[in-house]
Amino acid sequence: YGRSSAFRLQPDLNCAERGGERLEGLILKGVGSFYTVLDADGTEHVCKARGRFRKESISPAPGDRVVFTHKTGEDGSIAQILPRKNLLTRPAVANVDKLMIVMAASVPKPDLLLVDKLLLQCAQTGIVPALIVNKCDERERETFDAIFHQYAASGYALHAVSAHTGEGLDALRAEISGSVCCFAGQSAVGKSSLLNAILPELSLAVGGLSRKTERGRHTTRHAELWLAYGGALVDTPGFSLLETEAIEPEDLAALYPEMRKHAGECRFAQCLHVSEPGCAVKPLLDNGKLSRERYERYLLILEELKEKRKHRYD
């Protein structure tokens, strides 16, 4: 595990023109204008990005496969970013397979609006999400049950885990095996503790809660990629707000799996599932087949998107 496992993750990533100091590599992290790049031999190189990336408004990100030049005793230079399959922003991470959305079973209270926005980002970028409820040893079981109820109809993987006792970690390791997995969520939900439990050699700094606000103190400063379990783990800085990407209001419902599978039953093709006659989704709220709490957050996001569009064309 760790960095010595080099390119089991990228078996097709080979050195190119080694004699000419032109190599392919994988960005592990970026701090300021410097990037740590791992080559196919497992050697780390400190590189800077060429100026043309700034002109093109493109920034390298952890997870990027790149072509770089390197001379002994000098910093390398990133010459090319190879095609990405996706890019998460704030913080930037490229080529992600799965997003592990971490919540706490106790404090801080789960911000399910943030969770829903992260799920939307996954739907837009083709990333497979999984919901992780950490701190289950604190026995706030009703929190886990409430979360399970709200997302059961969506079909997302849901894991109850404890970084402290090890509960659920074997199933989580199986979930992440062979994939590039990004761990995200509010501050102080235990992302770093969870990653330390999964891969002890990380020794990531762990923060606590502010006593006044019960909100987390940020301990992760930069997104960083660690190779493990035939894939990679990424710890991202905690955040409390996430902007939705450019989604048209009419397209929002299709990003909710539990609504999408019933959309063809609605009378109108572009039913927003708000007050339209012949809507097939709203009756499912009344019989408990869909979560009313998640639906209410859908309405909040829908109004947010309508406001954004209105201001866009004002």
Give the positions of each predicted feature.
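Structural detector for short beta-strands of small beta-barrel domains
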Residues: 21-31
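Canonical P-loop GTPase G-domain recognition
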Residues: 138-189
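Short, structured beta-strand/loop micro-motifs enriched in basic residues and often containing a Trp
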Residues: 43-52
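Helix-rich effector regions associated with P-loop NTPase G domains
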Residues: 33, 51, 57-72, 82-99, ...
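SH3/SH3-like beta-barrel fold
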Residues: 35-39, 47, 68
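A conserved segment at the C-terminal end of the G1
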Residues: 192-204
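Short, Lys/Arg- and Gly-enriched loop/turn segments at beta-strand edges
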Residues: 73-81, 109-111
